[in-house]
Every structure is written in structure tokens, then in C-alpha cells.
């Protein structure tokens, strides 16, 4: 049989996995060959010295010879696959001959059923109002008792209510499982009214700027007035920067002016964390009258561009 030949477009074997960024000896950046083709040439070049311990997978599949001389132990199937129960079910598990008191006739010890009858499901007539899915406490162990003491096993409760005598059942001891409700039915819960306003309330914090003072691990976003200082950790630096920013925002919203003087033109009342003069950090949209300025942050550049546009409009008016 002739093996199928690979096209020249595919990387020759052997080669390293694409995306491998480890050490590869005698590999230089070359123009015209891919990474896989270059590594393939180096691996197949006889003049290049190679280590006897190869890191590549073997080219040919190894032949495994299984030893059948020794006898193997019988295979034990998984118990979960043979047990007819639901996984993680921890409630009552009745036995094969489980019977409810007063519902099934007594078992005949001597009678033998013909083959194939045990696979036929039995139709049991249940009384009105009987719910088989009603939760019950764990069933107590079966006990032996006389059928006269427990009632007629065939007619059940009807034998107690009717005045006419019924045919007597054979005196034979039989295991009965008795169940009773030991817990009162759960009371109906009152319909709770949903408070819609609770979704709009902010949490009450001990400190007004407690959220700002917590430095999130791995956060690499913009922090106002934060500078890298030698010997100061990240958390302390963020707390100092936010304190300075809060002071500057307070002085900006409440400028100092003597009695009778007009408020300065830089007073812009705002409830946001950033002033109305500057744009949002990392905004990459169009800003009129803004060019690349040296030694100016993005916020100061946008503020300067805003004031230039504001002065230009006032001058034209």
C-alpha cells in the first residue's frame, strides 16, 4: 500500500507545536520560512547536534505486547451501574416485597407463580384521596402481627366500617410496613410584598468614601492624583490619592471667596466624581481644538480645550 503524500503547504514532520515559545537552539529570525518549516529543517539536518532525549512524540506508534500467561481476576462491575436507584437519592427505599397495610392480599407461601408473572405489573386499586407521593418519615422496621389485630388485609378499612361480617382471612403472619404522618401540614405562607425601592437605595457605609478607599487587586484603571512613589505600597498610595482628590473636589465645588466678591469663573457645581470641565478618562472620541500637548494629562488637555472653545464663543458674541 502506498502512503498518501503530504502537500508542500503543510509543515514537514517532525516540527514543534505552533505557539511554542521555549528555547530552540540555532534558530534565528529568517525571512521566507515559517516557524514550523524552520524547526523541521533543523530537526532533520544531520549536521546539527541533537540531544538523545527527544522532547517530541515518537513518529511511529509503539507496539504493546500484552501478557496473557497470567490469569486475570474477574472484573467487578461498578455498583452504581447495577443498582436501580437515582444518584444522590437519600430518602426511603422500599424492598422488593414492600406492601402497604390493607392494600394487598396476604402472601401465599405455598403458592408458586407461573414463570413470567413477576414481570407483569400489578394493578392496585387505591382509595379516594390516597396520594402515594405524600412525604412520610422513614418507615419503621417490619413487625409480625396477627391479621385480626390489624384488620382485614384484603378489605382493609371497609371491613371496620361495614356491619355485615366478611369472610375471615387465613391466619397467617405477614410483615406489614406502617406509615403515619408525624408532622403537621405546612402552613401557607403569606404573600410578601416586594419593596421596589430597596433596589435603588445605596448601602450605608461607615465612611462616605469607603468604596473609593478600597484598592481592588488587579485593577489597572485610572486613579486621579495617583503617582508611583518609591517605598509606598499600592494600597496606601491609593488612599492618599483619593484623599487628595476629595479635598480638591471639595475646594472646587466650594471655592473660597470673601464676602461681597463674585464666585470665580472656575466654579462649576456638579455632583459627579469628575468635574464638568474634563472628559471621561480613556475617551478616544473627537475633541475640538485639542492637539498633542507635552506634560499634560488627558484630563487637563480636555479642560484646556474646553476653555479655549468657551473663550472663542464668548469672543465671537
Curated annotation (Swiss-Prot):
Keyword annotations from UniProtKB, A to Z: Cell projection, Cilium, Cytoplasm, Cytoskeleton, Flagellum
Record field: transmembrane: none
Main location: cytoplasm
One GO BP annotation of this record: flagellated sperm motility
Disulphide bonds in the chain: none
Protein purpose: Microtubule inner protein (MIP) part of the dynein-decorated doublet microtubules (DMTs) in flagellum axoneme. Binds to the intra-tubulin interfaces.
Descriptive protein name: Ciliary microtubule inner protein 2A
Natural source organism: Homo sapiens (Human)
Amino acid at each position: 500500500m502506498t502512503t498518501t503524500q503530504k502537500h508542500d503547504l503543510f509543515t514537514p514532520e517532525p516540527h514543534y507545536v505552533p505557539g511554542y515559545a521555549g528555547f530552540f537552539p540555532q534558530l534565528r529570525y529568517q525571512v521566507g520560512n515559517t516557524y514550523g518549516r524552520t524547526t523541521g529543517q533543523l530537526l532533520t539536518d544531520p549536521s546539527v547536534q541533537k540531544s538523545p532525549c527527544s522532547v517530541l512524540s515518537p513518529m511511529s506508534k509503539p507496539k504493546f505486547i500484552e501478557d496473557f500467561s497470567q490469569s486475570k481476576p474477574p472484573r467487578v462491575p461498578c455498583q452504581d451501574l447495577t443498582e436501580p436507584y437515582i444518584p444522590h437519592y437519600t430518602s426511603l427505599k422500599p424492598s422488593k416485597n414492600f406492601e402497604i397495610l390493607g392494600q394487598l392480599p396476604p402472601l401465599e407461601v405455598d403458592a408458586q407463580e407461573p414463570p413470567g408473572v413477576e414481570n407483569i405489573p400489578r394493578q392496585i386499586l387505591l382509595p379516594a384521596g390516597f396520594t402515594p407521593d405524600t412525604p412520610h418519615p422513614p418507615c419503621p422496621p417490619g413487625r409480625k402481627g396477627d391479621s385480626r389485630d390489624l384488620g382485614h388485609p384484603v378489605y382493609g378499612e371497609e371491613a371496620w366500617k361495614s356491619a355485615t361480617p366478611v369472610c375471615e382471612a387465613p391466619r397467617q403472619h405477614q410483615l406489614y410496613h406502617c406509615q403515619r404522618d408525624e408532622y403537621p401540614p405546612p402552613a401557607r405562607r403569606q404573600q410578601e410584598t416586594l419593596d421596589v425601592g430597596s433596589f435603588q437605595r445605596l448601602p450605608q457605609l461607615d465612611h462616605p468614601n469607603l468604596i473609593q478607599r478600597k484598592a481592588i487587586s488587579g485593577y489597572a484603571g485610572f486613579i486621579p492624583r495617583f503617582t508611583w512613589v518609591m517605598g509606598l505600597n499600592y494600597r496606601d498610595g491609593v488612599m492618599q490619592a483619593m484623599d487628595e482628590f476629595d479635598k480638591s473636589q471639595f475646594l472646587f465645588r466650594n471655592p473660597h471667596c470673601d464676602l461681597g466678591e463674585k464666585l470665580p469663573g472656575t466654579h462649576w457645581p456638579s455632583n459627579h466624581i469628575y468635574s464638568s470641565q474634563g472628559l471621561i478618562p480613556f475617551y478616544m472620541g473627537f475633541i475640538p481644538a485639542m492637539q498633542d500637548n507635552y506634560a499634560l494629562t488627558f484630563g487637563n488637555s480636555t479642560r484646556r480645550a474646553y476653555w479655549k472653545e468657551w473663550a472663542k464663543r464668548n469672543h465671537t458674541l
